[in-house]
Swiss-Prot record:
Protein name in UniProt: Adenine phosphoribosyltransferase
Assigned GO CC terms: cytoplasm
Localisation per UniProt entry: Cytoplasm
Quaternary structure and interacting proteins, as annotated: Homodimer.
Molecular function GO terms recorded: adenine binding; adenine phosphoribosyltransferase activity; AMP binding
EC number(s) recorded for this UniProt protein: 2.4.2.7
Catalytic activity: AMP + diphosphate = 5-phospho-alpha-D-ribose 1-diphosphate + adenine
Pfam families assigned: Pribosyltran
GO biological process: adenine salvage; AMP salvage; purine ribonucleoside salvage
Gene3D superfamilies in the record: 3.40.50.2020
InterPro entries: Ade_phspho_trans, PRibTrfase_dom, PRTase-like, UPRTase/APRTase
NCBIfam families: apt (TIGR01090), PRK02304.1-3 (NF002634), PRK02304.1-5 (NF002636)
Length: 185
């Protein structure tokens, strides 16, 4: 069986829909806008299939129990990946956004600190999860999410990212966790 992955048919066309927006949100920044990709059904389907691939074995069966998406664009991509895999979706939110008891992990930002949270009952001990997000930059959010999953007694099977900023050290922050990126810029 051929599984969709980073070389899946239609994926290169889908990734070509990502628009460059110069000087946004500030001068000197080249923003990568994924909204044109999201607006095209076939493109979104190709990206979801490729992001789901690390959550499957060679027969196509899911090898994860949950998909976690990091706030906020990880929600947009993670929920359909969970549907494609036939597993549940768990949102990882910024501090104070979840209404029930949570686990929390704080991590350093360039100028300060941020905290991520997940509901305490969102993962079971022993669950294997696939982390999904739109961008891997410094790796702080992904690393904090890995730590949060481990705090729940679960493990991260793999990380699936739409775009990796290759000029930043995000990959190194993941340690030995397998990483799939669909586009490196």
């Amino acid at each position: 069986m051929t599984l969709p992955g980073p070389e899946a048919p239609g994926l290169s066309e889908a990734l070509a829909l990502i628009a460059d927006v110069p000087d946004f949100p500030q001068p000197g920044i080249l923003f990568k806008d994924i909204t044109p990709l999201l607006a095209e059904h076939a493109a979104l389907e190709a990206v979801v299939a490729a992001l789901a691939a690390p959550g499957r074995d060679q027969t196509g069966a899911p090898v994860v129990d949950k998909v976690l998406g990091m706030e906020s664009r990880g929600f947009i991509l993670g929920a359909p990946v969970a549907l494609a895999l036939g597993v549940g979706f768990v949102p990882v939110r910024k501090a104070g956004k979840l209404p029930r008891a949570t686990y929390a992990v704080s991590y350093a930002l360039e100028y300060g600190e941020a905290t991520l949270e997940v509901h305490q009952d969102a993962l079971e001990p022993g669950d294997r999860v696939l982390l999904v997000d739109d961008v891997l930059a410094t790796g702080g959010t992904a690393r904090a999410t890995i730590d949060l999953v481990e705090k729940c007694g679960a493990s991260v099977h793999a990380v699936a990212i739409l775009m990796e900023l290759g000029f930043l050290p995000g990959r190194e922050a993941l340690g030995t966790v397998p990483l799939t990126t669909l586009l490196t810029v």
